[in-house]
């Protein structure tokens, strides 16, 4: 029975899924990744997660940003209450770390290989051990996302 529910969730296309999450977005969810970039972002998160080059959750992400780790922070745009993650964009700007919002904490959690919805993740190329040999799998899409972030910030 549980499998049927999961199948229903993914039966639509990603565009329909993206649009269905838009009404739940918080007003501070800017810069929000457009559909195409959102899809690329989720694939990159999934690949980075397989290599263990990802930090999940507010506590881990804040700790890494404060320590000066370089990477990409991805925040869920439908977190309630928004105070949970409202300090992270300011922290990222102070430390020159690019950040983006995605439409859903469920999609972000699924992409980062957890069964739970995830409020924020940080892709850290090389991971905690700085093992750059496994970065090649997602490096190209990671760099494309990083290039598109400044254009989205308004």
Swiss-Prot record:
InterPro entries the UniProt entry points to: eL8/uL1-like, H/ACA_rnp_Nhp2-like, Ribosomal_eL30-like_sf, Ribosomal_eL8/eL30/eS12/Gad45, Ribosomal_eL8/Nhp2
Signal sequence range: none
Disulphide bonds in the chain: none
Gene3D superfamilies the UniProt entry points to: 3.30.1330.30
Intracellular or extracellular location(s): Nucleus, Nucleolus
Keywords noted in UniProt: Nucleus, Phosphoprotein, Ribonucleoprotein, Ribosome biogenesis, RNA-binding, rRNA processing
Phosphoserine modified-residue sites: 119
Cellular component aspect of the GO annotation: box H/ACA snoRNP complex; nucleolus; nucleus; sno(s)RNA-containing ribonucleoprotein complex
One GO term of the biological process aspect: snRNA pseudouridine synthesis
SUPFAM superfamilies in the cross-refs: L30e-like
MF annotations from Gene Ontology: box H/ACA snoRNA binding; rRNA binding
PANTHER family recorded: RIBOSOMAL PROTEIN L7AE FAMILY MEMBER (PTHR23105)
Similarity comment: Belongs to the eukaryotic ribosomal protein eL8 family.
Described purpose of this protein according to its UniProt entry: Non-catalytic component of the H/ACA small nucleolar ribonucleoprotein (H/ACA snoRNP), which catalyzes pseudouridylation of rRNA and is required for ribosome biogenesis. This involves the isomerization of uridine such that the ribose is subsequently attached to C5, instead of the normal N1. Pseudouridine ('psi') residues may serve to stabilize the conformation of rRNAs. The H/ACA snoRNP complex also mediates pseudouridylation of other types of RNAs. The H/ACA snoRNP complex mediates pseudouridylation at position 93 in U2 snRNA. Directly binds H/ACA snoRNAs.
Subunit structure: Component of the small nucleolar ribonucleoprotein particles containing H/ACA-type snoRNAs (H/ACA snoRNPs).
Name this polypeptide is given: H/ACA ribonucleoprotein complex subunit nhp2
Gene: nhp2
């Amino acid at each position: 029975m549980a499998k049927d529910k999961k199948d229903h969730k993914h039966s639509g296309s990603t565009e329909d899924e993206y649009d269905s999450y838009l009404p739940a977005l918080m007003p501070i969810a800017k810069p929000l990744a457009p559909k195409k970039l959102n899809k690329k972002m989720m694939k990159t998160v999934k690949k980075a997660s397989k290599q263990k080059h990802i930090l999940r959750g507010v506590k881990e992400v804040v700790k890494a940003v404060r320590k000066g780790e370089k990477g990409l922070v991805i925040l869920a745009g439908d977190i309630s209450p928004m105070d949970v993650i409202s300090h992270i964009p300011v922290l990222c700007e102070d430390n020159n770390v690019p950040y983006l919002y995605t439409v859903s904490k469920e999609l972000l959690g699924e992409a980062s290989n957890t069964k739970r919805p995830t409020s924020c993740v940080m892709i850290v190329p090389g991971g905690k051990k700085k093992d750059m040999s496994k970065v090649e799998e997602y490096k190209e899409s990671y760099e494309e996302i990083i290039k598109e972030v400044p254009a989205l910030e308004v």
